[in-house]
């Protein structure tokens, strides 16, 4: 038997709580800042580049992975700056990602990004992240 139900009788399943909301950013042609030249930072640079971002990387030392990414012109603009990041590097960026071993460096980077109005992610340090 086919019974007709009204909307109030057929309630949709409700979603449980989420720790994070999955969001996709339109980064085509927008600038992203990465602090760190490590292989982990290179992986983030590769993701940003694949999304069309113009990536500026700041690190006193760059891994081979990072140098190879920057040399691959098919990836788009990946600019390596062989120096530490500065607060003035952040304004106008669509996002900032940092690779820091210590919480002090992570906290300073996150605070500077937020002060510039830039969403920030610190690799493997969720306490300092606005997004993952």
Predicted segments — roles?
Residues 59, 80-84, 124:
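Short loop/edge segments at beta-strand edges and connector loops
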Residues 43, 51-71:
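NAD(P)-binding Rossmann-fold cofactor-contacting core
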Residues 1-26:
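Glycine/serine-rich phosphate-binding loop and adjoining beta1-alpha1 elements at the start
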């Amino acid at each position: 038997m086919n019974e007709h139900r009204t909307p109030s009788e057929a309630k949709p399943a409700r979603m449980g709580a989420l720790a994070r909301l999955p969001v996709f950013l339109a980064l085509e042609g927008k600038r992203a800042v990465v602090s760190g030249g490590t292989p982990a930072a290179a992986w983030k640079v590769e993701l940003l580049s694949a999304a069309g971002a113009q990536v500026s990387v700041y690190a006193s030392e760059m891994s081979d992975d990072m140098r190879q990414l920057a040399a691959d012109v098919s990836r788009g603009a990946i600019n390596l700056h062989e120096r530490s990041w500065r607060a003035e590097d952040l304004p106008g960026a669509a996002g900032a990602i940092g690779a820091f071993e210590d919480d002090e460096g992570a906290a300073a980077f996150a605070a500077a990004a937020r002060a510039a109005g830039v969403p920030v992610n610190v690799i493997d340090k969720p306490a300092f992240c606005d997004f993952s």
